[in-house]
Amino acid sequence: MKASSAKTVDEFVTEAPVEARAVLEQIRSVVKQAVPDVDETMGYGKPYYKYHGWMTGVTLYTKHLGVEMWDGLPDQDRKELEALGHKTGSKNFQIHFDQAVPVELLTRLVKAQAKKNQLKKS
């Protein structure tokens, strides 16, 4: 999909296909609950989340969302995601619009990245 021209994440969600919106909102909610002081921004046509540095981003594709973890996915987490039916890469995983968001795992990943970032800034 081409990069969005949205200036805010709210605009991005509103402009997204209807079938993607609930998944986008759930990912957004998980990130904000896991790291309440997270900075939500748009860059390169997609939402990014920062806390003492880059944490995660979300890319919209035709049939799924790509969730990118800035420092990558640990092997154990990749295996867990794959067991749940998600395709993974070294730094990302896919959530198809009809798949459940892996809330507990995403929460753990986001909190771990926030902690890494905070330690880097110390």
Model-derived features: positions:
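Charge-dense, helix-prone N-terminal extensions
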Residues: M1-S122
